[in-house]
Amino acid sequence: SKKKEDFEKVRKLNTKDFFYMPGTILHLDSDNEYIDKCNEYYKSQNVKAYLYQYNESEFKDNVSKLIMKHNPKVLVITGHDAYYKKSKNNEKYKNSKYYIETVKEARKIKSNYNDLIIIAGACQSDFISLIKSGATFASSPKHINIHALDPAIIASIVALTDINNEIDLEETLNKTKYGSDGIGGIKTKGTMISVYPRKE
């Protein structure tokens, strides 16, 4: 049938006939040095990223306007944190509460997990609470330190994976310094759009 012939034609389209639009990344960080490192990494991966430096306590008040401004497909919220195992009050984490409230704020605007992939947390952050608050990827399951580039590595993989393809969680986490001990996540798809025909 003609419909079947058309389908076969589309299926056989050569990848060079397409052009690709990776998902845009919005990256909030409390550390200027980390921002510079991550910016270099994003450039090396050819992904579009907007990076902003704020103190962790300022993330929540700025995330909404930045999402509205840049309409990202991937949001990174990171900086510094610490886990106090023997804390005498309920504050077991230095900055996790700021990451959690920022994730919640972002989800008010983009509640659909496919519309915005959120990578949140820093060294020793409250993994379970971050996932429960709406993060797609978070640190740190084993309360260990993570490498400064780890969130950027995951963000780039998500940005460069086709929107119809599922992210290989195990493979992705294994590309970070400490694997699933440092960062965990939920099943999700990529954010890259393939456009046909390619315009010369």
State where each predicted segment sits.
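Extreme N-terminal leader/targeting regions
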Residues: 1-18
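A short, glycine/acidic-enriched catalytic loop
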Residues: 83-102
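Catalytic cores of nucleophile-dependent amide-cleaving enzymes
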Residues: 98-146
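Proline-aspartate-enriched helix->loop->beta-strand connector
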Residues: 67-80, 135
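Short helix-loop-beta junction
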Residues: 39-50
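Conserved acidic segment of CheY-like receiver
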Residues: 23-32
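Short beta->alpha junction loops
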Residues: 51-58
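C-terminal functional extensions of proteins
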Residues: 145-200
